[in-house]
Regions:
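Active-site neighborhoods and metal-handling regions in enzymes and metal-associated proteins
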Residues: 2-322
Length: 322
């Protein structure tokens, strides 16, 4: 069980977001952290991805070994083989954890408490939380609240009843990664916020419908952008989906805007679709001093949903839908 942090709410200043986008707390750049406690414990019996520094769990913050992440080449899953079985298994595990952590989202709970609970869920499955130690990322998931587009770092800020929060998580198990995310609505979110979240969820489904053997990657972005614009939202172009399997991030890069990608999908292609929709016409984000958190320039809210998909001989399977 998570310990409620409702009494802490008064310790955090409520900064009102731009009124034209609704009623919600704005997260300012000054709330960024630049140092962190030691990473959460992971048993040595659990396999870790190669990018995790050898001394990540034993050295102080900023003292970790530098691990170069080489530029990855596109990979395909061998259909009908052990690789397909493993990637399906870990993707399902990721969705199970997301569903479970979503039930714990409520006012007063801190994102750090959510991260701790999620970490324990993943470890209990014998899996590793892929973000932990990736380029020395300090937590096991990302939590992006209101005007934060992506890569928010879990901290001690309690959730407010007017918040929306995206939780993005990835598991590493049996040599493969499973990646998914969702945006959750708290109890007092206004209609503009709810409309944004629902539109983003639908935009993901529209992107999935553009997938299949022989279909063009660029059509995913075209369909998503057209849908978003029709509903009065913009799409952030600073983040993309990505190929995934044995490697956390590799080509193809899945753009959620109109683009000129000439690639076509083939059976065995495994990748994520993860559009970030933003209120208003300015979708640009600015990076906070923590080097990770990206928040909207305009102060508008952003929402994101993500699925991991696998192209098959006759269509597309959504591996993180259960």
């Amino acid at each position: 069980m998570l310990k409620s942090s409702v009494p802490l709410l008064n310790q955090f200043k409520y900064i009102v977001g731009p009124s034209k986008y609704g009623i919600y707390p704005l997260l300012p750049p000054s709330s960024a952290s630049t140092s962190y406690p030691p990473p959460r414990y992971v048993p040595e019996t659990i396999a870790r991805p190669d990018y995790v520094p050898k001394n990540f769990f034993t050295s102080g913050w900023g003292e970790h070994d530098s691990v170069e992440i080489p530029e990855a080449q596109a990979q395909r899953i061998e259909m009908g083989g052990e690789g397909e079985r493993r990637v399906r298994e870990v993707a399902k595990m990721a969705r199970e954890v997301l569903n479970d952590i979503g039930r714990l989202v409520r006012p007063g709970v801190t994102t750090n408490e959510l991260d701790k609970a999620l970490h324990e869920m993943i470890i209990s499955k014998g899996a590793y939380p892929s973000p932990l130690g990736y380029s020395s990322f300090p937590r096991s998931c990302t939590t992006s609240v209101n005007n934060v587009i992506a890569h928010g770092i879990p901290d001690e800020r309690p959730l407010n009843p007017e918040d929306i929060i995206n939780i993005d998580l990835t598991l590493y198990f049996n040599g493969y990664h499973g990646d998914t995310s969702a945006t959750f609505i708290l109890s007092e979110v206004d209609k503009p916020g709810r409309d944004l979240v629902e539109a983003t969820k639908e935009a993901l489904e529209i992107g999935i419908k553009a997938c299949g053997p022989g279909k063009r990657y660029k059509d995913i972005g075209g369909e998503i952008e057209d849908f978003a614009r029709r509903h009065g939202f913009s799409v952030n172009g600073q983040f993309s989906g990505h190929g995934i399997g044995k490697i956390f991030h590799h080509p193809p890069w899945i753009f959620h805007l109109r683009n000129n990608d000439v690639g076509k999908m083939r059976p065995g292609d495994c990748f994520t679709i993860e559009p970030c929709l933003v209120q208003g016409s300015n979708s640009r984000g600015e990076l906070w001093d923590d080097g990770w958190t990206m928040a909207t320039e305009s102060g508008a809210r952003s929402a994101q949903f993500e699925h991991q998909v696998l192209i098959t001989e006759d269509g597309v399977d959504v591996l993180t839908r259960i």
